[in-house]
Amino acid sequence: SVEELYGHGIYDDGSVVREFLGKRKRLYADLLANDYEPPEELQYKTEYVQQIDDYLYKDVTYDAMWHFVGGLFPSPYAATSVREYFARGFEEYTMNNKKELKQSCPVLFNKIEALHALEE
């Protein structure tokens, strides 16, 4: 996978993680404002956590998540971990949804652009 090839280049400077956590904190606040009770870890965990995935999938539901992630994450599942955030962003990039990705996830978009340039 691209992440295995360039993992150090993706996460080392912390920019993708900072962007992801900023989005997770906003998601947390949006969920609270809409009478959900998200786990505290949603604000600061970057790795995959089963409790967070279960909460988003079972309690909020991925259908409802589309309402919260528009303009924030590439998809509901991209909110589950920073690795999934990168993977879904990369998928959007390769599926030619670059404009939307650049608008909603500029740091992630620029990181993928830089990795793409390395391959050429």
Predicted segments, located by residue:
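Active-site-flanking segments in enzyme catalytic domains
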Residues: 1-120
